[in-house]
Amino acid sequence: MPLDDGHVQDRITSFWSIVAPSYDSHPGNVPSLESAEHVAWIRAIERLLPPQPADVLDIGTGTGFVSLIASQLGHRVIGIDLSTAMLAEARVQADRRGLKATFRIGDAVLPPLDEVSLDAIICRHFLWTLREPEVALVNWRRLLRPNGRVVVIDGFLKNLTDQSEPENRGGLFERYYTEGTRQALPAMHWESVALVADLVKGAGFSEVTVSDLADIHKLAQNPPFAQPWYVATGRRE
């Protein structure tokens, strides 16, 4: 029996709250600050976001990887997540690095922000675990100012458990990402960037582009995807 929306999100949030303290220690999730991969991520995010300073929302921020890079680049950043444990880790990282970003509880499908208040919305390693992606992208578009952009960075999983290592040890991933949960996450099963492009176009964005981050993939110590990360972008007219 398919799970209802609330039960799906509860399982997802519980999983990421459990793994939050160890999330950054896995190189497939977050590269070390001094690594060539981290430098490459800074360059990529700088290229993908509008000129600074811009109002940026990082959806599914987790431990704040993208938010903190955007802050470092000079943007005004809000990162939202439903895992309080992940947000706590993000705040620790911000304090440790002397960076300013606002981290708050927020549902990715219906972010708690005013309409027409943002210049960019970005998410990384998140689309695959987003319920109701079609609804979410429509709602994201409403938050953007004219000419605001959406940036979706993700990839296609090697298999349904590789991305969660080492957290998957002991079957933790399968206990929370049950068959019923997976059925409610359509992008988890996608294997084509064309589907991602169709998602962004279907939400009403124009000038939709899809590219890859092959340069970062080559530098990654333990990339979570067999193929390079993809980047889908779109503009609100």
List each model region and its residues.
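Core SAM-dependent methyltransferase catalytic element
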Residues: 220-237
